[in-house]
């Protein structure tokens, strides 16, 4: 009856044992992965233990009430609390996204709207950097192509979370087309323009996740360029890698060293290949990634940022708030939590259609 929970309890105990071994902490990456998984399972274990205790309390109350009716008054409150904990446990046991513990690579790309779109791409980058800063996460700009007015035609950033919650679990919903409505700095008559920026979010892949055959790669080198296309380096330090089987192309020119640019490009390529493999393997992942940017068109929007009204609207969950200035300063938890809750509800509904799901009724 509790097979799924028993598996969690066994894994939790095994992780507890492994994390107590000093040898594990000699490898920081392994220790971090195990610690994150241990923290993820903790709420399930805690809820299950609480449910078991309440189940025993309800049984004891029934036995006492049989001998003394005065104890009957305690039963409804105990049963209500037991059901509330059971509902939480059902939610925790709903199928989880296997990538939730991973870090993120995010690409922000200007679309329709010219220089104004590039400027808003810069605004989005700062928004995500501030959000990461608020949560104590680490960020790293992997590659960037600036526009003439200080925006970004294209920028790629890595975001790494600490603790049990991976950056993917919060930022995976940011993939798609973001539309901005405001008066551009280049607009002399005060007219409101609409521009679009595309955001692509990928779980960061490790080398063990994706094996790349060097024979499948074409590597080209070229000189780095800045705004307006001018050369900013006298050596061929920029790197472009083409993955021949898929046609995926990744360029990197952020570092002064060709070797560093190559390593960064491979890092991005691994994440793109992992995302592609999951898209092809899982219908759910495919549906999710189809909602992300394919062509940066103003009609394929997931979110609108309306400056005149100080309004942010997420069109997937009918979320609307009038705190755009705070959102752009990194206060994203309101809209992200609305998306997390909607996703959890959808996963729970799917799990409830599964006849093999654990049934949390009182043991007799």
UniProtKB/Swiss-Prot annotation:
GO terms for cellular component: cytoplasm. It is found in: Cytoplasm. Peptide chain release factor 1 directs the termination of translation in response to the peptide chain termination codons UAG and UAA. The modification N5-methylglutamine is found at residue 230. SUPFAM superfamilies: Release factor (SSF75620). Its main location: cytoplasm. Belongs to the prokaryotic/mitochondrial release factor family. One of its GO terms (molecular function) is translation release factor activity, codon specific. Transmembrane segments: none annotated. Keywords: Cytoplasm, Methylation, Protein biosynthesis. Methylated by PrmC. Methylation increases the termination efficiency of RF1. This is Peptide chain release factor 1. Pfam families: PCRF, RF-1.
């Amino acid at each position: 009856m509790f097979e799924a929970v028993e598996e969690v309890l066994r894994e939790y105990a095994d992780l507890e044992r492994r994390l107590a071994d000093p040898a594990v902490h000699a490898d920081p990456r392994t220790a971090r992965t195990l610690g994150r998984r241990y923290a993820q399972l903790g709420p399930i274990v805690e809820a299950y233990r609480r449910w078991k205790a309440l189940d025993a309390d309800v049984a004891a109350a029934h036995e006492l009430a049989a001998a003394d009716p005065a104890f009957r008054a305690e039963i409804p409150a105990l049963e209500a609390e037991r059901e509330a904990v059971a509902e939480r446990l059902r939610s925790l046991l709903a199928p989880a996204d296997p990538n939730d513990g991973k870090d993120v690579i995010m690409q922000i790309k200007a679309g329709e709207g010219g220089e104004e779109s590039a400027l808003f791409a810069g605004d989005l980058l700062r928004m995500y950097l501030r959000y990461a800063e608020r949560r104590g996460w680490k960020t790293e700009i992997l590659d960037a192509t600036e526009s003439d007015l200080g925006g970004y035609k294209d920028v790629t950033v890595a975001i790494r979370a600490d603790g049990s919650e991976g950056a993917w679990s919060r930022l995976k919903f940011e993939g798609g087309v973001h539309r901005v409505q405001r008066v551009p700095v280049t607009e002399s008559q005060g007219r409101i323009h609409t521009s679009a920026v595309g955001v692509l979010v990928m779980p960061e892949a490790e080398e063990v996740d994706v094996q790349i055959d060097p024979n499948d790669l074409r590597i080209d080198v070229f000189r780095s360029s800045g705004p307006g296309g001018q050369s900013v380096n006298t050596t061929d330090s920029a790197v472009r890698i083409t993955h021949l089987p898929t046609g995926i192309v990744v360029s990197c020119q952020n570092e002064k060293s060709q070797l560093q640019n190559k390593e960064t490009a491979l890092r991005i390529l691994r994440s793109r290949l992992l995302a592609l493999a999951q898209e092809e393997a899982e219908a759910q992942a495919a549906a999710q990634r189809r909602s992300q940017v394919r062509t940066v068109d103003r009609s394929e929007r997931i979110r609108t940022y309306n400056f005149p009204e100080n309004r942010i609207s997420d069109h997937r969950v009918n979320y609307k708030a009038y705190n755009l200035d705070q959102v752009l300063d990194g206060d994203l938890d309101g809209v992200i939590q609305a998306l997390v809750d909607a996703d959890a509800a959808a996963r729970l509904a799917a799990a409830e259609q599964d006849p093999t799901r654990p049934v949390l009724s009182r043991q007799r």
